[in-house]
Swiss-Prot record:
This is Sucrose-6-phosphate hydrolase. GO terms for biological process: carbohydrate catabolic process; sucrose metabolic process. The active site is at E18. Substrate binds at P15, L16, Q17, E18. Its EC number is 3.2.1.26. GO terms for molecular function: beta-fructofuranosidase activity. Pathway: Glycan biosynthesis; sucrose metabolism. Keywords: Carbohydrate metabolism, Glycosidase, Hydrolase. It catalyses: Hydrolysis of terminal non-reducing beta-D-fructofuranoside residues in beta-D-fructofuranosides. Optimum pH is 7.0. Belongs to the glycosyl hydrolase 32 family.
Length: 33
């Protein structure tokens, strides 16, 4: 999946209160196979 799809899935899975954590996942995006 590409980066946009990955971000969209994070947005769907994570509540707004955890948006911060989204930045940590983005930072680790290169770890996604």
């Amino acid at each position: 999946m590409d980066k946009k799809e990955y971000i969209n899935r994070l947005n769907e899975q994570k509540p707004l209160q955890e948006m911060x954590s989204r930045d940590r996942y983005l930072x680790n995006f290169h770890l996604i196979p």
